[in-house]
Amino acid sequence: MDIVRMGSVASGGGSVRRTASSWRGTSGRSDAFGRSVREEDDEEALKWAAIEKLPTYDRMRKGILTAGGVEEVDIGGLGLQERRNLIERLVRTAEEDNERFLLKLRDRMERVGIDNPTIEVRFENLSIDAEAYVGNRGIPTFTNFFSNKIMDVLSAMRIVSSGKRPISILHDISGIIRPGRMSLLLGPPGSGKTSLLLALAGKLDSTLKVSGRVTYNGHDMDEFVPQRTSAYIGQHDLHIGEMTVRETLAFSARCQGVGTRYDMLTELSRREKEASIKPDPDIDVYMKAISVEGQESVVTDYILKILGLEICADTMVGDAMIRGISGGQKKRVTTGEMLVGPAKALFMDEISTGLDSSTTYQIVNSLRQSVHILGGTALIALLQPAPETYDLFDDIVLLSEGQIVYQGPRENILEFFEAMGFKCPERKGVADFLQEVTSRKDQHQYWCRRDEPYRYISVNDFSEAFKEFHVGRNLGSELRVPFDRTRNHPAALTTSRYGISKMELTKACFSREWLLMKRNSFVYIFKILQLIILGSIGMTVFLRTKMHRRSVEDGAIFLGAMFLGLVTHLFNGFAELAMSIAKLPIFYKQRDLLFYPSWAYALPTWVLKIPISFLECAVWICMTYYVMGFDPNIERFFRHYVLLVLISQMASGLFRLLAALGREMVVADTFGSFAQLILLVLGGFLISRENIKKWWIWGYWSSPLMYAQNAIAVNEFLGHSWNKVVDPTQSNDTLGVQVLKVRGIFVDANWYWIGVGALLGYIMLFNILFILFLEWLDPLGKGQAVVSEEELREKHVNRTGENVELLTLGTDSQNSPSDANAGRGEITGADTRKRGMVLPFTPLSITFDNIRYSVDMPQEMKDKGVTEDRLLLLKGVSGAFRPGVLTALMGVSGAGKTTLMDVLAGRKTGGYIEGDISISGYPKKQETFARIAGYCEQNDIHSPHVTVYESLLYSAWLRLPSEVDSEARKMFVEEVMELVELTSLRGALVGLPGVNGLSTEQRKRLTIAVELVANPSIIFMDEPTSGLDARAAAIVMRTVRNTVDTGRTVVCTIHQPSIDIFEAFDELFLMKRGGEEIYVGPLGHNSCHLINYFEGIQGVRKIKDGYNPATWMLEVTTLAQEDILGINFAEVYRNSDLYQRNKTLISELSTPPPGSTDLHFPTQFSQPFFTQCMACLWKQHKSYWRNPSYTATRIFFTTVIALIFGTIFLNLGKKINKRLDLFNSLGSMYAAVLFIGIQNGQTVQPIVDVERTVFYREKAAGMYSALPYAFAQVLIEIPHIFLQTVVYGLIVYSLIGFDWTVEKFFWYMFFMFFTFMYFTFYGMMAVAMTPNSDIAAIVSTAFYCIWNIFAGFLIPRPRIPIWWRWYSWACPVAWTLYGLVASQYGDITNSTLEDGEVVQDYIRRYFGFRHDYLGYVATAVVGFAALFAFVFAFSIKVFNFQRR
């Protein structure tokens, strides 16, 4: 950004030390130093004169460093320490020195008459519209999924309209973002802030309808490259977890290049030379360093300093699997990533989320200095700016419902609203006021015309009134005069597409990929270990002493061994899929910001994986080639090796391509399975060439595996070992040729080279397509926004002010489930407060005395010399929380707020707790306490695929006493929804946080409601307002206040509240770092009690007028302040009257009131076991029905595979005249079982993983025991698997043409059903036994490979060496194939094979399958399903991977 324009010489500058004149000021020094200073000056002048004489190119790359002597340096060779020292001299502390530094940059430019390039951004009559499904059509259910897909196809063909409704995002807005001024973008959620920023940055989604124009300095977007002229900083922090903060910023700086800085510095240097001006040496070195390519690190160091990231510069960014920097630091990295570039206009979207107010203030202040001094352009959207941050801005843009309500100087905005009849209260932040004043629900409280009754002023009214207001009139007249294009600085707009040359881009991407491969080395080591294990199993199963060369059947076993090698390397490439998809979001972000083209990203990912293929294949072939007894000719050995390397590279290329095509794990997984299936089935091993139908023969000729298999078979069977004729009476062909002919493989030796050529062709093709798909495709959109009728109506009313009732006439009343209740809620709302809730509850207090909590000392602290065994986190904390009193639990990070709350609520899973906790005078018992307490966690964890109403009904069903009947329960849920303002969202899908469904603030309210429907007496809330904007925080606090007013005991931890939120609390429990309390007591009116207490302590600074007491209180009680004042605030509190008062209160509340009894419940859970099972099953049913990406995709995938199999193996079930026919039939069964089974096992894992997180919360809340949850999760799969089996079984059985007898059909369906079932349960079991679905996937995949070997297809059980035969009995897939083959062919005695052997005898001899054992086989298959389900349930009950 411009901050780097501070950085940008173009933009003006380099890191500066004092200008030449001010830098030396020797006059004031004593003569003792005079001589050495003069000598230094002379030396410097001589060196400078020498640099001046150099040609321009060299002059730009030489500078003078003055740290401890004068030294000429080569700019390209600055070391890390030299750079750090330079930045340290220029900007010692960002808060104090940054402004001075930037002024020096500007002064140097201005002294020789060079202006900084500036950009004025205008938008005129800008409108943006989207299309979305409204009401029930938008909810993704099983049926909607299919009907919407069909409608999309038909509407694309212009046959019908799609049924989507237009929704306006921005409506005819105009304005100017001026250079040199800081503009703040404010507006409630959904007002269109992000869309406006994206439109101005030229990054809008192509599916939106946009009208109007956006210009930079009068130039339209197509006249320059907006993505590089401006920088858009988004809300989402997408970074590669394995890179450090410094590496992330340095890579970004390297890709974005130096812009026009170099040309401007050349011009600056020329003018200074002509005018004989000598610049400040440090400034000169900095400006040269940030203008010469290859020295990005100087810019990086400067930005790290400005953003306060130096402390974590060399820490990994981290992700879900790697521990890294904090959320607030990640947010700053996202900002820094764009600031290191030369962009001159900044559009920043909610850059303060997760930051405390002082950090936000410092970052915005640095941006402000840059914008003011270097003439940058900045429009910044902030969520909840503190008053001091708000005051840093010059202009305010206020959006509401897609219209501009105000745009102009900050000083005039309150004047405008007062003219409209609204006044900001004294103790209210202006930014908070502005976000609420346009909202229909909040507006009335700010009405200030006492002589007139309040009337609702709509957004349209505000917008029209602003055009008549003097600020609006000036803006209008300015917009009517076009920008004078002659004023445009030639360096202002960027016209080159990328920041550096193609060669440099390639180098940058190569070095990053190499770094990531080193960081991810464990993945490659793990893959090699996996290959060693599989190789060991393979070579001991196909051991050469058991591998004979006597007959064609022996040849088939060798083919199985070769096929195992090919398939292993094919599957080994599957890891590329997940690794590529994980990096795609970051790739799309950087591609769209024009960091690099797609080919520069794709080349390193391909080229650097080639050595890994060589290594993996070398490990495999060295282990298996001679041990398995392949032809011992060294040339054939190397040919075999080359083929494996090519297969490995082909597989990697294919899976990378599928990742780029699928772009999402579930979709790409499905594509990956399809691809593997087609490759394998049509590769010539499962079904031979002559049996492939003519409509599928193209698949055979286009399968890379066919070429690989032909080449590898020809290489082996035309070798010396197979060069013998077994039975001249039958055939003169050698044994090798006979094997090839029987399996339908070409016998020409040239097929080896044809195979090599084809594989090389595929490698090139897949990698080129990978590059093209990366270039052409955009990331998959988020789940379509689902808009309810209510929301649409609400938007319309807010915008126009029309009466709601008028609107209902024209709408389809059946569309939304909540329409019927909308009116009812409005009426009951008013009188609910008066009469209390439908269900009574007992108000209870909670007291705790001298609570100490400790954990085992972490090993790293012991390594640093700490001798204690335990680390104390809470040091004797005492307090009391009472009914009807709202208590805030506050303190700096690390004070132990959440720890105390977890201890009181009984949520800790480890550690040591001491002290007394009592509930209304009786000792706390966790079993009964869970029934009367609610806990709202900071992370809003809910099942994503149920609606708001269903979430609440489910919670009430399981947590209210069993005496409460269904009708009362529903009434109570309605009341709670009214209380927390969720009535209009009752039919909305909850969704996943940050992906789809409810907004953050709506999720917070749902979390509160889910606890409230349990009718608790005590509620704990962990940070209920974090991450919310001012208006959303106010709504949540209103919810909390309503809850307290019903007479409940409520405690909230809270982080940096605004004044009005802070003063909504009755009492404060303030803790300091280390787990001690320093103030426990009432706040008082305008926080007077709190202020008086701290101001009464000697040395504590007084609070300024209008300053936030919460911020002041945290500032004056820091550890640094304690050191300055020489006091301990915890000691001061323990010696105060307040402490004595609290101790008295605790002892009063710790004695039971006369006539009271202790809490007692006859059972641990409020509902009996059967009801728990029913409720869990009800929720699972709803979840599965509304999760078509899982359930519908599975049926779709199964149907397509069934049709493919059916048509490939058409009518082969009837052909049993040759051994090959039996192999083809077996091939169809083996492929189906393995592929659909593995697909089931893989896709169920993320579903169970998400639900398990919800299970941890619900179990801790005492809703149910682990078994009903596991029971429901197992049971809900059965009907879905049954439907899958019916679809698959009917299609395949009829098309392949198996024998249509009741018994055989029944057995086929039976084995398929239980096989799909045990695969699904196996996937679920792997999740239950591991911490997350990533590890579960690795664990389960390892077994799939082993099951593949022992399934009985690659090598039949009788041929498996005796030491491995036991495992074939423990392999579930072997039992399935036993059942399928024995039931279809094990009883055929009236048909013989080509050599006269009866089918039944052949099946028994070759495979070891007997028809009369079917009962045992069936029992075994059912047993595996039951075993996996049992282990799943057991693991869910026993293992808890949640650490608190």
Swiss-Prot record:
Q: Which InterPro entries match?
A: AAA+_ATPase (IPR003593), ABC2_TM (IPR013525), ABC_trans_N (IPR029481), ABC_transporter-like_ATP-bd (IPR003439), ABCG_dom (IPR043926), ABCG_PDR_1 (IPR034001), ABCG_PDR_2 (IPR034003), P-loop_NTPase (IPR027417)
List compositional bias (Polar residues) regions by residue number.
19-29
The family database entries (Gene3D superfamilies) matched by this protein are listed as: P-loop containing nucleotide triphosphate hydrolases (3.40.50.300)
Gene Ontology MF terms: ABC-type transporter activity; ATP binding; ATP hydrolysis activity
Region: Disordered; residue ranges are 1-36
Q: Keywords in UniProt for this one? A: ATP-binding, Membrane, Nucleotide-binding, Repeat, Transmembrane, Transmembrane helix, Transport
Q: How does it sit in the membrane?
A: Multi-pass membrane protein
Query: Its function?
Result: May be a general defense protein.
* Family note: Belongs to the ABC transporter superfamily. ABCG family. PDR (TC 3.A.1.205) subfamily.
Query: This chain belongs to which protein, by name?
Result: ABC transporter G family member 39
Q: Which organism is it from?
A: Oryza sativa subsp. japonica (Rice)
